Amino acid sequence: MRIELHGLEVFGYHGVLPEEQRDGQRFWFDVTLEVGDRGASDRLADAVDYRLVADAVREVSGRRFELLEALATETADELMRRFEPEQVVVRVRKQPAGLAVEYSAATAERP
């Protein structure tokens, strides 16, 4: 079983540039957790609660990171610790300051 959250929007103060650290910006997270048979019983107590996953992402993003890679890695590690999935994939996107691209992104996978 795979659960997914796409486009979880979080405001944070991540980045290398002083204006990114000072003013902050929006970040979008896509999270995939491989959870085995958890949830097949149709009981929330047996499953991974999507709200708790979103809360964990927000908590990690409440810290400051210079690099998207570090933010994605720490988020993936925290989700592994809290929910013990078989695998987790975290992708973080942002609109980069000073680059003429739609977005930049970093992806971390565990294990």
Predicted segments — roles?
Residues 1-111:
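N-terminal, polar/charged subdomain of small-to-medium soluble alpha/beta proteins
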